[in-house]
Amino acid sequence: MKLKKEWIKQGFINEPAPEGTDLKAEIRRMCKEKNAIILAHYYTVGDIQDCADFVGDSLALARKAAETDAQVMVMCGVHFMAETCKLLSPGKTVLCPDLNAGCSLADSCKAEDLKKFKEEHPGYQVISYVNTTAAVKALTDVVVTSGNAKKVVDQLPLDAKLIFGPDYNLGNYINSVTGRKMLLWNGGCHVHERFSVSRIAELKKQYPHAVVMAHLECKGPVLALADVKGSTANMLQYAKEHDAKQFIVATEAGILHELQRTCPDKEFIPVPPEISESGMECSCNECQYMKMNTLLKIYNTLKYGWPAVEIDEAIAKDAVKPIERMLELS
């Protein structure tokens, strides 16, 4: 198949489906025909989560990518997640519906900058959050997710000199609960950085009995207000297992779909966008990159087999090692 120049320029296929096409049904048909599975992160829109074979957080998606028998994986999330799938299953085709689906955290740590930082700190091990490019992972000793970071760090020698990046907030939290003094990269998620103490405090006045759940990518003062601190999977588990009927949720709004699906008798209140200096609200509780995934793009990527993720062999050889070490330790 010859790729159109406009597809390559755009980074995705924008061909319209034939009139009357049931996108979900056609996606499921093509998955069966091509031995493909749809993997979706909790932050994608509800229609995609409902159409997916597997929905999870970064850790669960990595595990699924490593164990699946499918020959084709469509990773509905962001680009580093598709790279992780390819690293763990190099012989399989990994499709990414939109190559523009990046990550502000991954963008905050370039491989050349990390390499220089390592050279300035000889003898240090590098712990990289999974929200990084394959090139950064290739410079890393072990990868972590928000769901297993503490568990992994706890297993490293107490006298180990550690660099943690790129999420400053997650690293700061891990330092606080482990007593470590890791050197922290100054990166952050554009969504979680914008949650504020004042907006959560306002919600607590409206819902005094609600449990506050906050993602570990949030700033320290926000985490200090939270009753539950953890990954998206941690939040889901807590909501399912506890009797509280109301939850204030400080993470990307896509998780509300799965929370409501699994706990239909409970109320989940998203922390609203903060008000800017201009008085305007921003949609900062949504990740613009996750929302680049659409049913039409999934339909097209399955139909045409593009965009497919490819990673330089030399980078892939080094990048897969810290991911495999993470899976062993967690």
Model region roles, listed by residue range:
Residues 1-230, 234-249, 256, 261-271, ...:
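Active-site loop-to-helix "anion-binding N-cap" substructures in soluble metabolic enzymes
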